[in-house]
Regions:
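Mature catalytic core of soluble alpha/beta enzymes
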Residues: 1-302
Length: 302
């Protein structure tokens, strides 16, 4: 009887250990599942716009930290207002010498000029003079005189931008010419963010850089992402339709985003390089679905 009692006790202890082990592993699985089901969400401000992120994965915090640092670097290189930026230095040196730039800047300017050629100049990276003249979206927005506009238009010319790949430098040949990468830099930044997320093993994320949206993978439940396309004639949040996508960039540009009104006429921020005035193409909004956000950004602006 004593022998049987000892065996029973041993069996009970083994059984209890097995049960506790199962409970322990189930608890770990549950905690991990909960972590996976709730994204890291953050809203920031950079590149002149509001940024929003939803990231799932155990490396989400580290990935977001690196992504924000990368965005900051891009902004530092391509700002038109920061005296330390490449673009600022190129602009103030227009009519003078070549200016050495970071490889990020050189790549984006090269892509911008490529899209200028492909669009026959409707996408125009040397439009900086017009942007500075109108100042739409700032407290100093204004309606320039016809003479001011004509002068700014005369300085536009993507064909004139000189690129020296060997020395990674850029030159604007005429004094007063100005680059502005506002129509393409956010797209480049979005692509760089997605590359960082992938390197960190992130499988599911939504990146929104002020309307430049990139959805990585699918949602955590394996369904496609739903990306709404804003109705330009309705208040924000009213959609023309919803795109169901994965691993895609969705970029929308519209004349409803930044504008001012004077004497009953609306002046928006998308310019026609040929006239110097806000474009009157008849299009209120353009949405581009693409594999790379830099492409969608440029095409939606053109």
């Amino acid at each position: 009887k004593n022998s049987e009692t000892i065996e029973v006790r041993i069996l009970k202890k083994v059984f209890l250990a097995v049960i506790l082990g199962i409970i322990f592993f189930l608890a770990i699985f549950f905690v991990k599942s909960v972590k996976r089901s709730h994204p890291l969400e953050q809203t920031s401000y950079a590149l002149g716009t509001i940024l929003h992120f939803q990231i799932w994965g155990k490396e989400a915090n580290q990935a977001l930290e690196k992504a924000l640092s990368r965005i900051h670097d891009i902004e530092v290189h391509m700002s038109t207002h920061d005296p330390n930026s490449d673009i600022y230095k190129v602009n103030v040196s227009s009519g003078s010498s070549f200016v050495p730039v970071h490889e990020d800047t050189f790549y984006v300017v090269e892509k911008a000029i490529d899209y200028a050629y492909k669009s026959s100049g409707t996408f125009e990276p040397t439009i900086g003079g017009l942007v500075n003249l109108w100042r739409i979206g700032t407290p100093e927005e204004r309606l320039p005189s016809e003479e001011e506009i004509a002068n700014a238009v005369s300085l536009i010319g993507y064909e004139e931008v000189q690129l020296d790949r060997k020395n990674m430098s850029i030159r604007l040949p005429r004094s007063g010419q100005h680059l502005d990468l506002g129509g393409i830099a956010k797209g480049y930044a979005a692509d760089e963010v997605v590359a960082i997320l992938k390197r960190k093993g992130i499988k599911s994320a939504l990146v929104d850089l002020g309307g430049n949206i990139f959805v990585l993978g699918t949602k955590p439940d394996s369904t496609l992402w739903n990306v709404g396309v804003q109705n330009p004639l309705e208040p924000r949040g009213q959609y023309l339709g919803v795109l169901r996508v994965s691993n895609k960039s969705v970029v929308t540009s519209g004349n409803y985003e930044r504008f001012f009104e004077k004497d009953g006429k609306r002046y928006h921020h998308i310019f026609d390089p040929a006239t110097g005035y806000p474009a009157e193409s008849g299009l209120l909004s353009v949405t581009i679905l693409s594999d790379r956000s830099i492409d969608g950004d440029a095409l939606s602006t053109a």
